[in-house]
């Protein structure tokens, strides 16, 4: 059994080298879901294997999809809606915000009640704006507690138009996916859309699957009664995961470059824009057709709109500690409602390491700082954990003990192996468990 407070021990080092970035979590989850909604058998190569993808696979099986894995390939025989029979009427969403939002919306197509639950940590992920829109379309929602899980949803929804909050792009993506396969016309308008690149990623998928819809600014219309044909797809590398390895190389005292492969330059992932931002701030980054080369270099801070790559807030906060001048990260209010309150969490932990990091309502103000080793905590958030690991590698002195690191499996299960391949001194902590428990409280 994996200990609940698994830890990393990190020492200052000078990373460099080459690594092929693991599959994108966002693409993997969408590929699994769309294949499960399709007619026929779809083939998905190089899907990420993680707790979130396991949650999506389990839920899609309950919706009637038949899924087998052959090596690194998934074979998915879809079961398009309308849904009438299930292997279970209880859907456990684990700790996956995407599974919670996307599958809740799809459950609104069912005439039978479905119980939606999840890990206790999922209760911090807002769902009320989506539930409200589904109720307006005719869904019955029962057993709501504090606007979160658990709840029971029963459809089917009817044709209509709703307005959905854009504070989290997953609400709009969930409605778009549901409208794409609904039997009746559906339309919706998005109010103040945030994280726009991630909503555009969903629309890019719908275009590739030949789903028809019209769009006027942030209002969309779906004609209904459409179907998804089976497809073959190879999942590209994850730009969000690549950001952590890129930061290892960018801040390195080595004279050697870091080269990251499996990153198609034309892929629409939102966090891809982070690399262009760093380049504009002076970082020595070369973006090629299928890889990115990062050379150790200095770069400026700045006033940075985080909305296009809000998930990169933790690692960008670390990078800004090493910038030549202060930085102000703003327009990241949604970062407070991720796996942790990322604004408060990363500020709190970096201050333990000597960082001058100050939370604002929607972001951070960061002054250049010399970091030192410390005992820090992941807040059970994979992106906080990996950002702090990078900070520990580039601390000016002392080791860093990073606690509760099992959360890294959510998006980058082999993060330590990747870091070690790049000559970063990060290892699973092997000290006495009782001592580790005391330190990691």
From Swiss-Prot:
Active site per database record: 311
Superkingdom to which the source organism belongs: Bacteria
Record carries keyword 4Fe-4S: no
GO biological process, one term: chorismate biosynthetic process
Presence of keyword Ion transport: no
Self-association state and partner proteins as the record states: Monomer.
Function: Catalyzes the transfer of the enolpyruvyl moiety of phosphoenolpyruvate (PEP) to the 5-hydroxyl of shikimate-3-phosphate (S3P) to produce enolpyruvyl shikimate-3-phosphate and inorganic phosphate.
Protein name (Swiss-Prot/TrEMBL): 3-phosphoshikimate 1-carboxyvinyltransferase
Native source organism of the sequence: Chlamydia muridarum (strain MoPn / Nigg)
Record lineage: Bacteria, Pseudomonadati, Chlamydiota, Chlamydiia, Chlamydiales
